[in-house]
Amino acid sequence: MILDRIMKTKYLQEPSGPVNILAVADEEVPKFHEKHDKYKKDEYEGIDLILSCGDLSYHYLNYIADVAHCNVYNVFGNHDELFPEGEPLGCIPIDGKFIVVKNIRILGLGGSMKYRECKKHQYKEEEMVKRVKKLRKSIDKAGGFDILVTHAPAFGINDGTDLCHTGFKVFKELIDEYSPKYFIHGHVHQNYGKFPKITQYKNTTIINAYRYHKFEYVFDEPEGL
């Protein structure tokens, strides 16, 4: 897809400096949590944006947002239920949404492949396709997106062989069509098998956020704008 540069500049008025991002998913990390003596506040030093790929508790997300002094943008995992006390303070749900934060266009799609009836945040492939279709207008209006945040991986790219951990084909189609800088997911725990932390697929860096991963988002220089 050829990006509409005029529409893109409407959303990204001018390039910003690098954005330091913390991505988290699936399993709580002792050094980030108040219950552990090894917790160090400097773990959050310089973090500008936090992305949660799901399956983390209310209190963990609430604590991270509070100590880091920045919002946590989260999608749901297949083990998540609706938070009993409402959305954690400092957390902004982006599941099924397209948003722009710090000049970064972010698309959020939580949940896993449907493997059990009567469970929330599980979808058949065709159901996920419908979710994506609802967001197409917003995506195209913005000239694409920069980061895809999901719980499940993309089909055929570091996904599992069982139904639960099979990735979505539509995620791969989104990457092929829009070439985002990053695709960040969780769900396939690295202790389940030899799943790499970082993979390069075409122009997209894929990050398995299991537990956590820190990285720096650097803006491209504008081309002839």
Report each predicted region and the residues it spans.
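N-terminal active-site segment of His-dependent metallophosphoesterases
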Residues: 1-64, 136-144
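Binuclear metal-dependent phosphoesterase catalytic core
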Residues: 2-18, 98-102, 123, 174-178, ...
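Short glycine/proline-enriched coil/turn segments at helix->beta-strand junctions
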Residues: 18, 46-48, 68-71, 88-90, ...
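Active-site neighborhood of phospho(di)ester-bond hydrolases with catalytic His/Asp-centered motifs
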Residues: 23-25, 49-55, 73-78, 94, ...
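Conserved catalytic scaffold of divalent metal-dependent phosphoesterases
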Residues: 24-32, 76-166, 211
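Metal-dependent catalytic neighborhoods of phosphoester/phosphodiester hydrolases
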Residues: 33-38, 56-70, 81-91, 159-161, ...
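Active-site regions of enzymes building and remodeling cell-envelope glycoconjugates
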Residues: 48, 69-74, 87-97, 201-209, ...
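A short, gly/pro- and small-residue-rich
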Residues: 68-79, 168-171
